[in-house]
Amino acid sequence: MTTTRVLVNDIELPTATTHGGGGTLALLTLDNGADHKIPTTLSPDTIAELTGVLLAQRARAQAGEIVALAVTGKPYVFAAGADLKRVSQVRDRDQALALGRDGHAAYSLLADLGVPTFAFINGVALGGGLELALACSYRTISGSVHAVGLPETSLGLVPGWGGATLLPRLVGIEAAIDIILTKPAANRQVSSHEAALLDLVDVDLDPADFLERSIVWAAGVLRGDIVVQRRELDDAAHWDAVVAAAKTRLD
């Protein structure tokens, strides 16, 4: 079994002559040591390691050692979701609850880190991989990415690490229903271009030097040179109607 590890590197951010800036960004890379034919997945062991890494980075943030944290993946893959082999080994309710709670606890640390967090989506981001990106403050995506989504419902599962609540808050209930229910039923996902149009990500960057551009973009956000505008969503009154329409289409 190939276990995804969480590798940490410190990146010194570029400064601007007019606004200063700089500082250290902790870059976390999800990597299982194999090529893209074996996508990185998130096993309970990976989630436990991620939790430990994030706790350590939170302590560094409190000490003023880092000004931001970013998560990315190995070439062509951000993260392809939970390790389904391990999920299939769940035998009782307590194990299922532990799996969900551990993922929630790890991802919640991103919101409680004390510094801005970034997801540099360099490749496939599905299920728990997309939920990891949603838990971050900001998201960049490579223009070559063609598979972003929450396909769990096609397997008889639900997004269990926050996607079902975080996604509609970001893109609205109609787009969220499409990503969570309609697209998986048709075996379709979201491309980088669609993700940018939906405001699922904040910026779509050239894949040729995606990581470098993402770091420069993050530095601009931290300096205040780049201001990310988020839509004000007021669609609570439409939730029931949208969900009912989706049920009708899928029945």
Descriptions of predicted regions:
Residues 1-72, 108:
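Conserved CoA-thioester-binding segment of acyl-CoA-metabolizing enzymes
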Residues 85-90, 131, 136-142, 168-170:
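A glycine- and small-aliphatic-rich helix-loop capping segment at beta-alpha/alpha-beta transitions
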Residues 71, 83, 132-133, 195:
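Hydrophobic/aromatic residues within transmembrane alpha-helices
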Residues 104, 110-155, 159, 187:
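Glycine-rich beta-to-alpha active-site loop
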Residues 137-160, 164, 173, 199-214:
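Gly/Pro- and small hydrophobic-enriched strand-loop and loop-to-helix capping segments
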Residues 1-29, 176-251:
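Amphipathic alpha-helical segments at domain termini/boundaries
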Residues 37, 72-105, 125, 154-157:
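Glycine- (often His-adjacent) and acidic-residue-rich active-site loop
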